[in-house]
Amino acid sequence: MSSRDASLTPLKAVVIDDPPLRQTPEPFDEQSAYNPQSPIAIDFGSSKLRAGFVNHATPTHIFPNALTKFRDRKLNKNFTFVGNDTLLDQAVRSQSRSPFDGPFVTNWNLTEEILDYTFHHLGVVPDNGIPNPILLTERLATVQSQRTNWYQILFETYNVPGVTFGIDSLFSFYNYNPSGNKTGLVISCGHEDTNVIPVVDGAGILTDAKRINWGGHQAVDYLNDLMALKYPYFPTKMSYLQYETMYKDYCYVSRNYDEDIEKILTLENLDTNDVVVEAPFTEVLQPQKTEEELRIQAEKRKETGKRLQEQARLKRMEKLVQKQEEFEYFSKVRDQLIDEPKKKVLSVLQNAGFDDERDFKKYLHSLEQSLKKAQMVEAEDDSHLDEMNEDKTAQKFDLLDIADEDLNEDQIKEKRKQRFLKASQDARQKAKEEKERVAKEEEEKKLKEQQWRETDLNGWIKDKRLKLNKLIKRRKEKLKLRDEMKDRKSQVSQNRMKNLASLAEDNVKQGAKRNRHQATIDNDPNDTFGANDEDWLIYTDITQNPEAFEEALEYEYKDIVELERLLLEHDPNFTEEDTLEAQYDWRNSILHLFLRGPRPHDSENIHEQHQMHLNVERIRVPEVIFQPTMGGQDQAGICELSETILLKKFGSQPGKLSQTSIDMVNNVLITGGNAKVPGLKERIVKEFTGFLPTGTNITVNMSSDPSLDAWKGMAALARNEEQYRKTVISKKEYEEYGPEYIKEHKLGNTKYFED
């Protein structure tokens, strides 16, 4: 890590675990305070159920609308857990089921058991059924089959005296306007959908109401999908409850989405708006070693390293000697054939395994380049090794000039050893001479460069910049090619396989014409790769030797760094931001900022492996109710729907609102559990200000807990005896008119929508 990165303060990571389990079961209401005449209001939502007697200010029971049937194998008994009781145990919570499938109740057996649980905890004393009247919420434009099933459960199963059905968002509006004759506009953000309903004189105008098929449930699923695409190899699977926590705690509605999305992935913005969430995991702690154990381990690694270095040096020396002998042999062959007839030259070369003279020259050139490279590597070894070897072997070369016939078996073995040591010494000496020659050439080159720079600085800078750009471009192409090679489905990889197949076919046709594997260590000596620069591209295309490819990249990088150093020193217009390192700096990578936030990423850190960064998603997910197409919904957003209602309905004209629309604008209500997302009210005020005529007064209301508005509206209606009586369907009416009967009132659905 660079010093610049080390100075950055680490971002705080928030561990997102499943919500904690409850320690106590759902409490029971006192039966002593039970009043059989008091209506019971039940907001039967797809996420939460809120229930209580209407003489209370708030519902006394709020719990998840879910049920678990759990079998205890030890006790060999079945248990039923409902609502908050499903949160008492992790195994029970993981098996909980909802009676809803999307916005509709589909499991009526679960519904009946949940109602049993609700009435029991409310302290209801049964008297041939439930003696209390019931107020129940339903969705906008609910289907007849849903209400029919509710009729059957309430009247036939529970024998209730009367029931009131009403739209949840209109109950919420009634809570703010208990007189029942106010005009306004309701924006209901629910768990399964979002509704915009105009209200005139206290009655919902359902023919002009609009629904968006997007709610809190879809928002959490959308966040789940986005994070799964963002981190496809995340080590653990996050649960729905964890994503729900992330959505509720960290997502917010942007006041100006288009502007914010443009600048959200900047370092300055991410420092304050990037949220790091971490999935819980069990960290395996390595046992701590004592200082003595660490010292012994370090010494062992050091000894092992020395042994491996020595083995590598000896192996490298063997290769160098072999290449040197081969080069000297073929150089003599080349010199001997200088004045010979072409026919004889071709015959000699073909006997040696070459196709023609051109093939021989290419091979010799490749061998010379490989030898120079090996000599340079050998020359970089410590000089004291050479001196030690020279001192030890100077007096042991006396057997080299004696014929094998005059030596015994042990002396012959010693002679072979001396021959190898002598060849090694000669090779090192030649490597030294080559190194000195190269150093001298480099010094002369530096002097020429200096003279050129002093006489023509602009030309020198132009030349260096051109060389630097070529090197960087070539390096990027190679890196891109390497990455594509790793993808078996890429076009480059497929072309490579075709080339390999073609090469294999050619080799089969040629047969074993040339067999000189003993001539060189690197590769088949007939492979003249390296004679032309284009051969390197072919080599990288086939990638038969990835080590050589990486080595070539390393040499290229050194050349790039050296050119950048010269330009930084002598070119006033070349800065650190122009260097190759700056181009690969994580600060300049939008992808890094998107995935890893405003800090460098350590892939070896176990905590960072389990972390996700919320940045774009924080405003993208809530934005869907304003732009449903972002979530795959071919619908208009809430502000566009509101604009149509206010500017094109109820007698409004372009540039002039009708009195009804003015009354609606002055009484806008935001309600529903999904309305808790921060910034929603401010965004709606801004959007309304944008499309309404200049100077229009806007009043937007939203309670501190909009999820309770519907229940409070039901309680307020029940306390108004005159209005409540008009909404109740008695059991007698149900028996007389049947399950298709619906009593129309200002807060409920109607049987037909009339144009």
Curated annotation (Swiss-Prot):
Q: Where in the cell is it found?
A: Nucleus
SUPFAM superfamilies named in the record: Actin-like ATPase domain
Phosphothreonine: modified positions: 24
- Keywords, ordered alphabetically: Isopeptide bond, Nucleus, Phosphoprotein, Transcription, Transcription regulation, Ubl conjugation
Q: Does the keyword Metal-binding apply?
A: no
Q: Which Gene3D superfamilies match?
A: 3.30.420.40, Actin, Chain A, domain 4
One example of a Gene Ontology biological process annotation: regulation of DNA-templated transcription
- Superkingdom classification of source: Eukaryota
| Cross-link annotation Glycyl lysine isopeptide (Lys-Gly) (interchain with G-Cter in ubiquitin), location | 12
Q: Spell out the Basic and acidic residues composition-biased ranges.
A: 425-444
Residue ranges for the region (Disordered) are: 418-444
Q: Which GO terms describe its cellular component?
A: cytoplasm; Ino80 complex; nucleus
MF (Gene Ontology): enzyme regulator activity
Task: Kindly list the positions at which Phosphoserine occurs in this protein.
Answer: 7, 383
Chief location of this protein within or outside the cell: nucleus
How does it associate, per the subunit comment?
Component of the chromatin-remodeling INO80 complex, at least composed of ARP4, ARP5, ARP8, RVB1, RVB2, TAF14, NHP10, IES1, IES3, IES4, IES6, ACT1, IES2, IES5 and INO80.
Q: What else is known?
A: Present with 2170 molecules/cell in log phase SD medium.
**Function field:** Probably involved in transcription regulation via its interaction with the INO80 complex, a chromatin remodeling complex.
PANTHER family under this entry?
Answer: ACTIN
For this entry, the protein name equals: Actin-related protein 5
Q: Which organism is it from?
A: Saccharomyces cerevisiae (strain ATCC 204508 / S288c) (Baker's yeast)
Please state the gene responsible for encoding this protein: ARP5
